[in-house]
Amino acid sequence: MNRLPNSASALACTAHALNLIEKRTLTHEEMKALNREVHDYFEQHVNPGFLEYRKSVTAGGDYGAVEWQAGGLNTLVDTQGQEFLDCLGGFGIFNVGHRNPVVVSAVENQLAKQPLHSQELLDPLRAMLAKTLAALTPGKLKYSFFCNSGTESVEAAIKLAKAYQSPRGKFTFVAASGAFHGKSLGALSATAKAAFRKPFMPLLPGFRHVPFGNIDALRELLGECKKTGDDVAAVILEPIQGEGGVILPPSGYLPAVRKLCDEYGALLIFDEVQTGMGRTGKMFACEHENVQPDILCLAKALGGGVMPIGATVATEEVFSVLFDNPFLHTTTFGGNPLACAAALATIHVLLEENLPAQAEQKGDMLLDGFRQLAREYPHLVQEARGRGMLMAIEFVDNETGYRFASEMFRQRVLVAGTLNNAKTIRIEPPLTLTIEQCEQVLTAARRALETLSTAQSTTAVATES
């Protein structure tokens, strides 16, 4: 039997990869070879731009550090055996830590039975996860659509709002400046960063943006849309803007948005892809002011850092537009048994260990420390802000933020900038971070700022002379 063209090359690649997957440790020579190999394959087959983006995690100036395995709940180990304290959290996916044993065990047990669903028989874990989210989420949220990512959950929310509001003659969506809701076409239409939007114009029609946190601007736009017949179908917001730079709205803003939506018959969509699952000190950030959305978007930490999963949770009134034709919006892998097992275990850990409360306590400790550093280094730091374990340090310019991330990396602490605000470095560790590790982060931040300050002073003296 003839093999397929190019099969020998592909087989060699898969055999090599499977051999690596089986290995627990690497020799020094194997590490060096793997680092070079991964660098080359990123450059030649993934995207060379990622190598530049990951400059802050570069060893020796010629290749990016290559991830190998989790260390403990809150650490990562690279191929050279160096252990890093994770304060980036995979952009917010590791709320219950790396390889949390409860989550891993649930996924392994389900894997031993059936990894994916048949699409014909009823899958029990999807039913149980939907019931769990109905019990856990605020207000009248009752039905869940499951997908694989935050962007997909936002896409589902937009389509759900469209299906509900189109018969009512409402087609306009309102999002906020600085917003990040994803990069697929619908989600990107709500996202507010020109660099992400411009190459794909025109996006979906009917999306408007108002300043985040400005209730008067929202009121004015809703009124204007009403007068011109462009009635608003939905307002979509992050309760705290993550990629925008960890921007908190003024107190009372979210309740006022809820009131305006009710007044104008608009749905309220909360994108809690990054703020949900205990990250801010409550299970969901909207609970800080007891605001209940019509649609809630979840993902990232929902899978416990083990499986990708997203969810779009809605009230029965809104979700009922899918009852007559449940195939109106579906996805092959959404709600698969492995992902649902991970999500159920993640929620169990969050509740059993009261991790949202821990996030509030340890977040307060870290934020107090960062604010003290901001006062000590005002020539470098503009502001430290956040809520719970979602924090940011905003520097005076992009270069200073980049150099801070590089210095933290040298001290084996992982941090990175936000997508919409390059001079803002996010601090988004697992909620399982210990008090001792919190102190380690603050010590590393102080040393990094001391290094930057000394370098700045040296440069200034050299310039004067």
Curated annotation (Swiss-Prot):
Check the record and name the InterPro entries matching this protein: Aminotrans_3, Aminotrans_3_PPA_site, Class-III_PLP-dep_AT, Putrescine_aminotransferase, PyrdxlP-dep_Trfase, PyrdxlP-dep_Trfase_major, PyrdxlP-dep_Trfase_small
GO terms in the biological process aspect are: L-lysine catabolic process; putrescine catabolic process
Instruction: Give the UniProt keywords, A-Z.
Output: Aminotransferase, Pyridoxal phosphate, Transferase
**Enzyme Commission code(s) on record:** 2.6.1.82, 2.6.1.29
SUPFAM superfamilies referenced in this protein's UniProt entry, alphabetically: PLP-dependent transferases
Catalytic activity reported: an alkane-alpha,omega-diamine + 2-oxoglutarate = an omega-aminoaldehyde + L-glutamate; putrescine + 2-oxoglutarate = 1-pyrroline + L-glutamate + H2O; cadaverine + 2-oxoglutarate = 5-aminopentanal + L-glutamate
N6-(pyridoxal phosphate)lysine-modified residues are: K300
- Which top EC class applies here? transferase
Q: Which residues bind pyridoxal 5'-phosphate?
A: G150, T151, Q274, T332
Q: In which pathway does it act?
A: Amine and polyamine degradation; putrescine degradation; 4-aminobutanal from putrescine (transaminase route): step 1/1
What are the protein's GO molecular function terms?
diamine transaminase activity; identical protein binding; putrescine--2-oxoglutarate transaminase activity; pyridoxal phosphate binding
Q: Which N-terminal residues, if any, form the signal peptide?
A: none
The prosthetic group or cofactor this protein requires is: pyridoxal 5'-phosphate
Q: Does the keyword Amino-acid biosynthesis apply?
A: no
List the PROSITE patterns hit by this protein, alphabetically. Answer: AA_TRANSFER_CLASS_3
HAMAP family given in the database record = Putres_aminotrans_3
Task performed by this protein: Catalyzes the aminotransferase reaction from putrescine to 2-oxoglutarate, leading to glutamate and 4-aminobutanal, which spontaneously cyclizes to form 1-pyrroline. This is the first step in one of two pathways for putrescine degradation, where putrescine is converted into 4-aminobutanoate (gamma-aminobutyrate or GABA) via 4-aminobutanal. Also functions as a cadaverine transaminase in a a L-lysine degradation pathway to succinate that proceeds via cadaverine, glutarate and L-2-hydroxyglutarate.
Name the PANTHER family for this protein: AMINOTRANSFERASE CLASS III (PTHR11986), PUTRESCINE AMINOTRANSFERASE (PTHR11986:SF112)
By sequence similarity, the record places it as follows:
Belongs to the class-III pyridoxal-phosphate-dependent aminotransferase family. Putrescine aminotransferase subfamily.
Instruction: From the Swiss-Prot or TrEMBL record, give the protein name.
Output: Putrescine aminotransferase
Gene it is expressed from: patA
